[in-house]
Amino acid sequence: MDGKALTASSLFDITGRVAVITGGGTGLGLMMAKALEANGAKVYILGRRLEPLQEAAKQSTHGNIHPVQCSVTSHADLQGVVDHIAAKDGYINLLVNNAGISTPNLGPHATRPTPKWDISKVRDYWFHKSFADYAAVFETNTTASLMVTFAFLELLDKGNKKSEEEAKASQARNGAGKARIEYVRSQVVTLSSVGGFGRDNSAFIYGASKAAATHMMKNLATYLAPWKIRVNVIAPGYFNTDMMGNFYKATGGRLPASLAPEERFGDAQEIGGTIVYLASKAGAYCNGMVLLVDGGYVSNKPSSY
């Protein structure tokens, strides 16, 4: 292999890739969309609210971020998006399951308990939470990732076939003979969370939904192997998102070393660089992986992974 193939411009080249990101109008979804698009990909961003998606698209580098209104918990919406992208491009190379919600209605007893707490109040606080609210967290954070993946399965498969044909044509032009055809295979990346690893917080349903999503994606990596579709997980720590915005403002983006050895929130370059790595030749050998992007948060919690 010559040196040119090992340069950053070759290793991380994603020119012409087609990506879909759920929850792509804000937060981590937007950070990843901008990074992919800035490096040559065409990116469809999905979300329930059209206005934030349209504003997000204005932040593109090359005018190649495309907003599509869609609820990830609606079969009809998902089918509509699949049909739209099939008509426009006919395939995708990357699906990022990023849409997520937090545990609703957290309050004074959503921290680590102490013996001073009135156990009757603790009981009432948790017992009277809504079953529907908690079910909605699993519906969005876990079930929807599976549904969205299967919705786009045929387009991911067509992405593989297109990449394989392009690789064959390239080999023929270069006189490579009948060497094995290699290409970057289609991929699903699901955003989990460090909250799915720890066991010392009280966001019970959120943490459980993210732990379930992580495990489910490992299952899916095995299930989709016959079609050569890869599945990986990114488990982010603290980033300045809608979900963590108030905490970011309160801390000025700084964290104690006991919480994260890097002592700060992650930024757009770090989550953006992660998704570009996974989408490119540099990350093409990754499958069934859980990648922690957390500034060391989980490493501070022994036996958590």
UniProtKB/Swiss-Prot annotation:
Biological processes, Gene Ontology terms: (M)-viriditoxin biosynthetic process
One Pfam family linked to the record: adh_short_C2
InterPro entries: NAD(P)-bd_dom_sf (IPR036291), Sc_DH/Rdtase_CS (IPR020904), SDR_fam (IPR002347), Sec_Metab_Biosynth_SDR (IPR052178)
Pathway the protein acts in: Secondary metabolite biosynthesis
Annotated knockout phenotype: Impairs the reduction of the C3-C4 doucle bond in the heptaketide monomer.
Job of this protein: Short-chain dehydrogenase/reductase; part of the gene cluster that mediates the biosynthesis of viriditoxin, one of the 'classical' secondary metabolites produced by fungi and that has antibacterial activity. The first step is performed by the polyketide synthase VdtA which condenses one acetyl-CoA and 6 malonyl-CoA units to form the heptaketide monomer backbone of viriditoxin. The product of VdtA is then O-methylated on C7 by the O-methyltransferase VdtC. The O-methyl group is important for the stereoselective coupling of the monomers at the final step of viriditoxin biosynthesis.
Protein name: Short-chain dehydrogenase/reductase VdtF
Organism: Byssochlamys spectabilis
